[in-house]
Structures are given as C-alpha cells and as structure tokens.
Amino acid sequence: SEEVLKLEECISQLQQNSKDAVFMAYYNEMTYENISKAVGFPVNTVKTWVRRSKDFLNRCVRGLH
C-alpha cells in the first residue's frame, strides 16, 4: 500500500544505528538493555535513538519532515 511505501522510504532516511535500534525494539521485541549490549552503546543512547526515530517517522509519514 501507499502507507507502507511511505514508511519504508522514511525508515531508509534513518541513520544506521537508529534504524538498527528501532528494528531490534519493535520487530525483535528486545529490551533497551539487550539492544544496548548488542550494539555496545549505553542504554540512554539507545532510548534516545528509538525516541527520536519514532518522532521522525511520525512526522515523515505525515509529510511534516
């Protein structure tokens, strides 16, 4: 659908670290702590990546970026 294509386009604009964190959090259902261990960055950094990515994706999908 058009919405899926738009979301894929928006996801492609994320930095790789953020993209990885979002996929681990939502598709793999990993905790922030486990993502932190997997990527080697502090938990708060991972939380920031996910939060900013969610905000960006919401704006992007609605055409507000």
Language-model segments: residues:
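A short pre-motif secondary-structure segment
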Residues: 21-25
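Acidic, proline/glycine-rich intrinsically disordered inter-domain spacer in sigma factors
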Residues: 1-12
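The N-cap/first-turn positions of alpha helices
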Residues: 17-18
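Residues within the DNA-recognition helix of helix-turn-helix
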Residues: 49-52
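Flexible coil/turn residues that form the inter-helical turn or adjacent wing/linker of helix-turn-helix
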Residues: 28-29
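C-terminal edge and immediately downstream basic/flexible tail or linker adjoining helix-turn-helix-like DNA-binding
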Residues: 4-6, 33, 37-40, 54-65
